[in-house]
């Protein structure tokens, strides 16, 4: 389990280096502990593996003031475990259910046990700024548009394939639009007074 914890920690540290999430950001985690242990999703939930993943992932995120949502399995319609404070901050609707390893999954259950004031919410309303998918459980529905894949050097947590994504604001405009501050300042040069 120590190898799982270390891999999760390395992955989230690399993620945060590539995409520095600030205080108040929302990170979504989806994962299958069965896949982490080399089994097919849903066949071997493990609270021990779930706690190892969370021990690696949570501290770097929480130290930065990032809100964390942990996705439950399809039996709970991909509902998510969050802190009550997170639900309030993002206007999320609480649902009346308690996860367990066979209905919700081990990762959501472990998060519910670890969080200080946990609630389960129906959806993130596509407000997550970034996230990780451990084992191909699909988190895209929770991400803001536009999602951008992050290629990390950590490719697996245990035996589970690791996918990561950040998001960026939509690019709007047409042929004359610019998308960086540098481009904007260059365009402004033609409007500045010329020296005599």
Swiss-Prot record:
Pfam families: DUF436. Gene3D superfamilies: Hypothetical protein TT1679 (3.40.50.10360). Signal peptide: none annotated. It comes from the Bacteria. Belongs to the UPF0340 family. This is UPF0340 protein TT_C0214. It comes from Thermus thermophilus (strain ATCC BAA-163 / DSM 7039 / HB27).
């Amino acid at each position: 389990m120590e190898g799982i914890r270390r891999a999760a920690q390395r992955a989230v540290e690399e993620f945060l280096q590539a995409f520095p999430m600030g205080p108040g950001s929302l990170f979504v985690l989806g994962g299958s502990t069965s896949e982490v242990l080399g089994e097919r999703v849903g066949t071997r939930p493990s609270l021990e593996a779930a706690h190892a993943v969370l021990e690696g992932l949570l501290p770097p995120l929480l130290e930065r003031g990032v809100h964390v949502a942990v996705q439950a399995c399809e039996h709970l319609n991909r509902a998510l475990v969050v802190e009550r404070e997170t639900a309030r901050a993002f206007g999320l609707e609480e649902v009346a259910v308690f996860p367990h390893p066979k209905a919700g999954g081990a990762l959501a259950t472990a998060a519910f046990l670890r969080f200080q004031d946990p609630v389960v919410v129906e959806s993130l309303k596509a407000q997550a700024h970034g996230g990780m998918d451990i084992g191909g459980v699909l988190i895209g529905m929770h991400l803001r548009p536009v999602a951008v894949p992050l290629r990390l050097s950590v490719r697996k947590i245990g035996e589970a394939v690791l996918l990561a994504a950040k998001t960026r604001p939509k690019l709007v405009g047409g042929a004359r639009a610019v998308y960086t501050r540098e481009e904007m300042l260059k365009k402004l040069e033609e409007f500045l007074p010329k020296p005599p």
